[in-house]
Amino acid sequence: MKLSFILSTLVAGALAYNEFSAPGPNAVLQEGGGVNTVSWSNLTSSTVTLTLYRGGNSALTPIETIASDIDNTGTYLWNIATYYEAADDYLLGLSFDGGETYSQYFTLQACSTCTISTSSLSYSGTISSTSIAPSMIGTRTSSSYFITSSSSTPSSSSSSSSSSPSSSSSKSSSSSKSSSSSSSSSKSSSSSSSSSKSSSSSSSSSKSSASPSSSKSSSKFSSSSFITSTTPASSSSSGAIVSNAKTASTDDSSSASSATSSVSSVVSSASSALSASASSASASVSSSASSDASPALKTGINALVAVGVVSAIALFL
């Protein structure tokens, strides 16, 4: 009786409590492949918590709580999600009142029709690395991915998010500078245009100030056109004179002297008419010309009138 009690006590002491039986060493579990059965034996404690770990023997780190405070029945149906990175350094931990046990290392990978997504992992306890002997869980030399990724990802995210505004602000400042430059250039072009317009205005002013001489020239041309317009009248007079001359030539020789004298009188009257026309033209030119007309211009006009008179007389003769 005493011997059997001692033997049962020794056997119970040699057995580990809540020892994992599945998953087995180096098992391959499919993410998204359906329900996987997790089992353990030599039960103790009324409730247990199931946790997923990852990492090497010297840096084993909890990454997600699978089930918290479940009844200690020795089994759990685990429907593996598809957001775990495919790797071979996963294991399960079972915590209970008085201790914790671990499974052997196993592999997680996506099923043939599944795609691994990304999601935030949730762990309810304090994240700290644990060292477990290879004789208990197997051997892995990889370091903790969770600590590395969790510490680097937020910082990289914050750095990228912090760099984005600066980049945006630098772009905004560049855009502002560009718009300022374009505005300045447009203002410069406007100033250039204004200066060009000012120079044009000054040029127009200079042309306006030079208008008296052009007025004199136009007056000169007006006098010329006036004289030219008077020329047809003198031509009409010469036509009348020629007609009279032809009439006189039909008379007999006895009246030739009287015809000659009549021609002379007509020439005299034509000369008087041309002189009067020239005088009126000169008066018109003088009235249309400005008060500051040069003597040379007046002399030219008088000479032009004289040439017209002489030409008319020569035509009659």
Curated annotation (Swiss-Prot):
Glycosylation sites: N42
GO cellular component: cell surface
Keyword Nucleotide-binding (UniProt): no
Disulfide bonds: none
Alphabetical list of Pfam families matching this protein: Kre9_KNH (PF10342)
Region spans: Disordered: 150-259
Keyword terms, alphabetized: Glycoprotein, Signal
Keyword Signal: yes
Signal peptide: 1-16
InterPro entries: Kre9/Knh1-like_N, SRP1/TIP1-like
Low complexity composition bias: residue spans: 150-238, 247-259
PANTHER family linked: GPI ANCHORED SERINE-THREONINE RICH PROTEIN (AFU_ORTHOLOGUE AFUA_1G03630), MATRIX PROTEIN, PUTATIVE (AFU_ORTHOLOGUE AFUA_8G05410)-RELATED
Name of the protein in question: Uncharacterized serine-rich protein C1E8.05
Organism field: Schizosaccharomyces pombe (strain 972 / ATCC 24843) (Fission yeast)
